[in-house]
Design a protein with these regions (language model features):
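Beta-propeller domains
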Residues: 148-173
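Short loop/turn segments that connect beta-strands within beta-propeller blades
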Residues: 38-41, 76-80, 121-124, 171-173
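Structural signature of WD-repeat beta-propellers
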Residues: 29-30, 67-68, 111-113, 162-163
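Tandem repeat domain/solenoid detector
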Residues: 70-71, 81, 114
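Extracytoplasmic beta-rich repeat domains
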Residues: 4-21, 43-59, 82-105, 129-155
Length: 173
């Protein structure tokens, strides 16, 4: 119907888009604070200690955040309790551009440099990993092949593109 359900101000500038599951909405401020709203009212706030440019993902009463440093954090949407952190080794140089963070069935899909990882959203463990970008070039900047958002999901397929390179699709099942 287009009827406004709620409107609010969090009192800070937003660094990335809004993530929502219809009940909870989550944003990250430019000061690195995760703000979660429940029905438009502030539920809780957490300092992240990392720069974030990818919109949070809200799914299954959890809030997932992907930092520019490729660290993935999971929080309980109800009380803000940190559930787990996934930090993978990778290249020192990363992009300050929105990455890939999506959900499919019981798997969290996360861009980790040029690779797409399927992560268990309950435990933060990597179930599978697939290379989607091919770093090429003579220096670190030319070799950047981080997956950048937004990703597109069509049925069981997820399509993404890497920085300075072609895109690709994979079957998530």
């Amino acid at each position: 119907t287009g009827r406004e359900l709620w409107r609010t101000s969090i009192g800070a500038r937003i660094a990335a888009g809004v993530g929502s599951d219809g009940r909870f909405a989550a944003v990250v401020t430019r000061d690195g604070e995760l703000v979660v709203l429940d029905g438009g009212k502030p539920a809780w706030r957490k300092e992240l200690g990392a720069k974030v440019v990818t919109a949070p993902l809200v799914a299954g009463e959890r809030v997932f955040v992907l930092g520019v440093d490729r660290r993935v954090l999971a929080f309980d949407a109800l009380d803000g309790r940190k559930l787990w952190v996934l930090q993978r080794p990778g290249e020192a140089l990363t992009l300050a551009q929105a990455g890939v963070l999506a959900a499919f069935k019981d798997t969290l899909l996360v861009g980790q440099g040029p690779r797409l990882a399927g992560v268990d959203p309950l435990r933060g463990t990597v179930r599978w990993e697939v290379p989607m970008g091919s770093p090429r070039g003579t220096n670190e900047v030319e070799r950047l092949a981080d997956l950048i958002g937004p990703a597109l999901r069509l049925g069981t397929r997820l399509c993404a593109r890497s920085f300075q390179a072609a895109g690709g699709c994979l079957d998530t099942e």
